[in-house]
Amino acid sequence: MMELLDPQRSTEKTLTTVLAVTGLDVDIRTPTGTVRVVNKVSFTAYQGQTLALLGESGCGKSMTAKAIAGLLDPVASVAGGVVALEGKDLNTMGARARRAVAGPSLGIVFQDALTALNPVYTVGTQLGEAFRIHRGMNKKQARLQAIELMRRVGIPEPEVRASAYPHQFSGGMRQRILIAMAVALSPRLLIADEPTTALDVTVQAQIMALLRRLREEENMAVVLITHDLAVVAEEADDVAVMYAGNVVERGPVATVFSAPTHPYTKGLLESVPTHAVRGDELSSIPGSPPELKNIPAGCVYQDRCPMVAAICRETRPELRQTGENQFSACHFSDVLVTQAGNPTNDHSITSPQHEENQ
């Protein structure tokens, strides 16, 4: 019988836990009442590795990231759970204590670089701010550090460009500046929220390569938020698949993508048109995700699931172990485990930027 336990990853190589999220709940206040937008989300990010939060728009990926970083909008609040950064629960700390812990140890890269940067300050000033606040440097010292950061992330002529404003940079260069800001204090954890949004394919490849290099140089944990299965296949070690505010499957990318044990994950993988034949109908998941204010009783995926049964409408499945370090929230995950003899080939999921580099 499959266990309902959720143990830490057990591997021969010892992994150091940087971030452990357990049972995270996030609520939003609306004119019609409180809406649960993140529900009992749990995952672990390890030093030197990348965990991907994967799912459709509105599934709760970015809200989860904001809750971890303490950047929720005023109408949103953490309603429960533990966010432990290097063993310290950020949810139990006041604002000042949280900044002291998370400020130097956690960096975040937002998806819209133009709006994330302040238009009235030079990029050198903005990059140097972290050094002035957390390292006590003066303006001259901070500027030198900012220039070195710009050089490190591949911005040409950093001594000159440090005096430029955000609008004077291309989209790709602005994203590099955001990444530089995020890693300025050598954080233990980097959250990258859709870091290649609105960038062309070539620039996407460059940004992902930069993040990969910085992760290796700093030996930091990375939480990568994306809806792109190809990016997950190439960049992540582990994946947590989210749907309607819930993690429905979690495990090593190679395992989850080759033998998914949740119908939603399986549907996503089958929707990739890698092996599509011209003229044939493309595979897709019918319907739309439920409105978060009207989540049905039972399984959150029931209205779109080809395996739905009476129990799915009555009882919400808990995450349970389906394989080594793999967990699925499905009443019929054992059926999918049996079907894994004909697995989806994760090597067939290739990102455009990978093909561009061939």
Map each language-model feature to its residues.
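Short catalytic/signature loops enriched in Gly
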Residues: 4-5, 14-17, 156-160, 250-358
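P-loop NTP-binding/switch modules centered on Walker-like glycine-rich loops
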Residues: 56, 191, 195, 199-280
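Conserved ABC transporter NBD signature motif
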Residues: 77-89
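Conserved ABC ATPase "signature" region
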Residues: 89, 140-160, 269-270
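Conserved structural motif at the start of ABC-family nucleotide-binding domains
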Residues: 19-21, 38, 101
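ABC ATPase NBD coupling module
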Residues: 90-107, 125, 133, 139, ...
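A short, proline-enriched helix->beta-strand linker immediately N-terminal to the Walker B motif
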Residues: 184-188
